[in-house]
Amino acid sequence: PGLVVLAGFMRILTPAFVQHYQGRLINIHPSLLPRHRGLDTHRKALEAGDDVHGASVHFVTAELDGGPVIAQARVAVNPGDDEEKLAARVLAREHELLPQVVAWFAEGRLAMRNGQVCFDNRALSGPLQC
């Protein structure tokens, strides 16, 4: 396949699989990476007192949630938020973010070169904000 998309996959991939699809394997993660890698991201954001939380789409590498971040969508953490309320707002942004990144890839606008995200043939200094 030209692109493998992980969404809610919740499994560790083998190094051979990741290497085989290097640059063609993306994941959506419910935090503003590199902050709050792994599980329970909404709880972690609330416990840390974060003012902003969100979602990231990144290229998958051997490091868990450690690949180059392509794009992010932010949401405010509101007073009175609990995990469920925050998760619902983040999920809504994920549903906007992931199709946009897939479209950019399909249009040939997005690539990973030398471990760096390139958009419109230019290396990015940070994630695209959506």
Description of each model-found segment:
Residues 3-120:
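Donor/substrate-binding cores of folate-linked one-carbon enzymes
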Residues 123-130:
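C-terminal accessory domains and tails appended to enzymatic cores
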